[in-house]
């Protein structure tokens, strides 16, 4: 019996309208009623997640910013990591050969120097929004992560530049095909979930996790049971071939799996609907 379930959000729980489907909500409530601790592990900001969970009537532990912050159900901080100040300064001052927009995340919000209203569509439920700023107006300390947003091919080329200039000083991952993240070295959802598990007197073997992108890899590979979404990035499926693939997000595949696990855990699971 797993005692904690960790869920990615975008591409795992959130539908195309950026809301959790009603069948999935019902399954999550059933899971909580069965005594399983709910944890939401996402690249989204705490303020964003607070709004989403409030709208959905859910409560649980939060791993946000791809592991840069861990909070309890009341929002009390349990663990955090920030980018080194000198690395933040380097990223902001370097004229990267790219058209990607740059986004910086701190406890007090999401900051960018480029106004792109289309990016707010994914945050309509919570009302979370970016704050336009000049980079030299922000402190160099207290910064969780950078996101670069552009086409995938452009980000692949940018990633090569970043790795060449900052090898060993930060970690890089694609949280979506059009979003490249720069994280503190050694920071990911897997490490954050391990910290949370220890806080709850659990081990990662006591946990199950669901995800669809490369920012879920460490979490999925280290828990007792990792479940890969049917719509997951091909690279994730290739790098974790040993893990079960379940249904797609838009089919509420998480709910389908949870209903099976809660009612017939002794039977072989099939993602077919």
From Swiss-Prot:
Keyword vocabulary terms for this entry: Hydrolase, Magnesium, Metal-binding
UniProt xrefs under Pfam families: Hydrolase_3
Alphabetized InterPro entries for the sequence: Cof (IPR000150), HAD-like_sf (IPR036412), HAD-SF_hydro_IIB (IPR006379), HAD_sf (IPR023214), HMP-PP_phosphatase (IPR023938)
Span of the signal peptide: none
Binding residues annotated for Mg(2+), in chain numbering: 8, 10, 212
Entry annotation: catalytic residues: 8
Principal EC category: hydrolase
This enzyme's EC code(s): 3.6.1.-
A Gene Ontology molecular function term of the record: magnesium ion binding
Cofactor(s), names only, from the UniProt record: Mg(2+)
Catalytic activity: 4-amino-2-methyl-5-(diphosphooxymethyl)pyrimidine + H2O = 4-amino-2-methyl-5-(phosphooxymethyl)pyrimidine + phosphate + H(+)
Primary role: Catalyzes the hydrolysis of 4-amino-2-methyl-5-hydroxymethylpyrimidine pyrophosphate (HMP-PP) to 4-amino-2-methyl-5-hydroxymethylpyrimidine phosphate (HMP-P).
Family annotation (HAMAP family): HMP_PP_phosphat (MF_01847)
Family to which this protein belongs: Belongs to the HAD-like hydrolase superfamily. Cof family.
Name the record gives this protein: HMP-PP phosphatase
